[in-house]
From Swiss-Prot:
Pfam families noted in UniProt: FtsL (PF04999)
HAMAP family, alphabetized: FtsL (MF_00910)
Disulphide-bridged cysteine pairs: none
Record keyword Transmembrane helix present: yes
Any one Gene Ontology BP term: FtsZ-dependent cytokinesis
Cytoplasmic topological domain residue ranges: 1-3
Subunit structure: Part of a complex composed of FtsB, FtsL and FtsQ.
Organism: Burkholderia pseudomallei (strain K96243)
Similarity comment: family membership: Belongs to the FtsL family.
Protein name according to UniProt: Cell division protein FtsL
Predominant location: membrane
Gene: ftsL
Annotated function: Essential cell division protein. May link together the upstream cell division proteins, which are predominantly cytoplasmic, with the downstream cell division proteins, which are predominantly periplasmic.
Localization, UniProt: Cell inner membrane
Cell membrane found in the keyword field: yes
Length: 109
């Protein structure tokens, strides 16, 4: 065999190994893609389930039931309501200086 034939054989073998390597990488990336898509689908299902649970837990009837049973709260009645009346000078507005870190920095006036 001539040197040219040996050189070409080495080039062909290198190309064949390169094709095998790229095919293997493509398969691994495709497997990762399928796993990511499966995880995305599972997360979407979990999110929908959590939204349903949130809506069920935030219903007014459930909140009232928990307030009366767990916290021993009772509905407001006029007989138990106490009204406070203030004398005309009892409520007085007082200016309190703000610390420098809480002072407004030029918003709307």
């Amino acid at each position: 065999m001539s040197r040219l034939n040996i050189f070409l054989l080495i080039i062909v073998m290198g190309c064949a190994l390169s094709v095998v390597n790229s095919t293997n990488q493509q398969r691994q990336i495709f497997i990762q893609l399928q796993r990511a898509q499966s995880q995305e689908h599972q997360l979407q299902q979990d999110y929908a389930q959590l939204q349903y649970q949130q809506s069920a837990l935030s219903k007014t009837s459930r909140i009232e039931q928990l307030a009366t049973s767990s916290l021993k709260m009772q509905p407001i009645t006029t007989g138990r309501t106490q009204y406070l009346t203030l004398s005309p000078g009892a409520a007085k507005a007082v200016d309190v200086p703000l610390p420098a870190s809480a002072a407004p920095t030029g918003g709307a006036r």
